Design a protein with these regions (language model features):
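Bacterial N-terminal signal peptides
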Residues: 8-17
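Cyclophilin-like peptidyl-prolyl cis-trans isomerases
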Residues: 2, 16-193
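Bacterial N-terminal signal peptides that target proteins for export
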Residues: 1-9
């Protein structure tokens, strides 16, 4: 009986150790004037997109960037497929890096659910430093979704692990159009881990 108890305790400890060591994914902090948003980046599932985001992060190119766009059902009168996101990044694209290949959600398995971070883009292969965070589930942004005519969706690459209350406060700001009159300053984006 004692051997069984010891075995169960060792098994439980092993599970905790394995699960704790399993996440080698980087964690970044988006430091805004409204609070911090911490995000786990899924380097194991979206390696190209995460490497690109970290290149901007490590080069301090997100310093003094902003959240400038809030997309809600009430400010998309002409869009048949409505989404809910906050968008940020570098409005000044000078000094940035080349666009990256498009890692679709069908390739990565990272779907646009509540708190997921994803790259903004015009066409496939055009993403650089603009990103958005989903407020609620947004399946129309996944591969095969109807938000983009090309059906390729957007490149989701991580999830908010703390600070969704900050995301929701930004989302709730008054915005007559999709673009904030007073942008929310992002002081910096840096690695935590």
């Amino acid at each position: 009986m004692i051997k069984r108890i010891i075995y169960v305790i060792l098994l439980i400890n092993a599970v905790f150790v394995i699960s704790g060591c399993n996440s080698r994914n980087p964690i970044i902090s988006i430091k805004t004037e409204m609070g911090n948003i911490n995000v786990e980046l899924y380097a194991d599932r979206a390696p190209v997109t995460v490497a690109n985001f970290l290149k901007y992060t490590d080069s301090s190119l997100f310093m003094n960037s902003c959240f400038y766009r809030v997309v809600r059902p009430d400010n998309q009168p002409h869009d048949s497929v409505k989404i809910e996101v906050i968008q940020g990044g570098r409005l000044d694209e000078t000094g940035g890096f080349s666009p990256i290949i498009h890692e679709t959600t069908s390739m990565t398995g990272v779907l646009h659910s509540d708190g997921v971070i994803s790259m903004a883009r015009l066409g496939p292969g055009s993403a650089t430093s603009e990103f958005f965070i989903c407020v609620g589930d947004q399946p129309s942004l996944d591969y095969g979704g109807k938000r983009n005519r090309d059906g390729q969706g957007f490149a989701a690459f991580g999830r908010v692990i703390s600070g969704m209350e900050v995301v929701r406060r930004i989302y709730a700001l008054p915005v007559p159009t999709q673009y904030l009159e007073k942008k929310v300053t992002t002081y910096n984006i840096s690695r935590i881990k």
